[in-house]
Amino acid sequence: MRKSHVLVLAGILLLLSPVLSQQKSLKVVLLYDMEGVSGATSVRHTDFGANPEYEEARKSLTADVNAAIAGLKAGGATEIIVVDGHGSGNSQGPDVLEAELLPPAKMISRDRSFDIYMDSYDQSVDAIVTVAMHAGAGNPAGFLSHTYTIEDIQYRVNGTPFNETMIMAMGAARFGIPIIMVSGDDQLEKEIRRYLPWIKYASGKRAAGRTKAEPFPREEVSRRIEKAAREALLALDTARLPENFPGPFRFALTFQDESQARTVAGLQGAELLADSVSVQIRSVDFEEGYRASLRLISAAGLVGRVQAMQRVLTAQPNAAALRDAVSKYITDRWLDPQPAPPAPGGAGAPQRYWGAR
C-alpha cells in the first residue's frame, strides 16, 4: 500500500473516530422507587391498593422514569434495564406503566423473587441510576423516609446512616459499577450530597415533613431528570465508587423499642448494644452482612406487627371476644390441622416478579 493511501486511510479513521466511539455499547440499570416520585405528596400515592391517588402517582412515576430514559439515551445508553424497586411488582405488576416506557428501555421480571439491591445487575452493566428514591430512616424531615422497611428501623454501616440508594451503591461496588444519577426529594438530596457528593441529583419536590411534599412543576422536573441523567452518563469516565468499599463492615440496626432488639439479639451473630434498642453484626463481605441484616429486620418486623395488632385489638370494644376467637383458632389449628387451601386462581400462569422484595 502506498504511503499516500495509508495517510488517506488514517485520515478517514480519524474522522470516523467520534462516530465509532458513540456507537460503544453502554448498558444501564434504572431502578425506581415510588416515595420520591415528583407527584407523590401523600402516603396514598404510594399505596398500590385500589385508589385514584395511586393511579395518579403511576403516571407521574412513568414521566420521571421516561425523563431519565431520554437523558440516558441522549448520553449514549444502548441498553436500559428498568427494575421495580417499590414492591408492588410482586403482587399485581410493576408500578410504572410498562407499555408507556420509551425505547430502548425494557422491564425485567423473573419467576422467583430477587433482591433489587444485590441481584438486579451483573458485571455486564456499566452504570446504575435510581429514580424516585427517598430519604433514609431517622430523617424526620424526609417525605415517607425509611430504609428498607416501614418499621422505621434505622440502618447504619460503619457508623454512617444509610438510605436505600447507599445500599444499592455499596452492592454495585462489588462489581465496580457506579451509581451515577439519583432523583427524589430535597431531603434525600442532602443525604446524597453528604455521602456520595459526586452523583448527579435531580430534585422533584420539597419535603414538608414525613407525610407531605410540595412538588415542582412537571415540565421542570422532567427537564431536571433528563439533564442529570444525560450529563451523568456522558461523564461516566469520572464516576466514583463509595470510599469505604471494601470492608470490613459493621451493620447496626436501631429499632423502635427494646423488645424488637432483644428478640433478634443473638440471631445471625447480632450483639445487643448499650442503648438496648440497637443490635450490631459484623461481616468482611458487604453482601453477606446486608443479607444477614434483612433476616434480622424480618424477625423484628414480625414482633412489631404483633405488637401493633395487640394494641389495635385492645382498643376495640369487643377486645375480649376477639382475643378468645384468636386463641380458639390457634388451638383448633394445632389440635385439628387442615390441609392448606389451593392457591388463588388454581394452577394458572406462574408468579412473575418485577423487583422489590
Tell where the protein language model's regions lie, with residue ranges.
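Bacterial N-terminal signal peptides that target proteins for export
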Residues: 1-8
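Bacterial N-terminal signal peptides
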Residues: 8-18
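Boundary at the C-terminal end of the N-terminal hydrophobic targeting segment
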Residues: 19-23
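Glycine-rich nucleotide/cofactor/substrate-binding loop typically near the N-terminus or early
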Residues: 24-26, 40-41, 65-123
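Short catalytic helix/loop segments, enriched in acidic residues and glycine
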Residues: 46-67
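C-terminal accessory domains and tails appended to enzymatic cores
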Residues: 80, 221, 228-357
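Divalent-metal (Mg2+/Mn2+/Ca2+)-assisted nucleotide/phosphate chemistry catalytic cores
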Residues: 105, 117-174, 178-182, 201
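Glycine-rich, Lys/Arg-enriched anion-binding loops that position phosphate/diphosphate groups
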Residues: 161-265
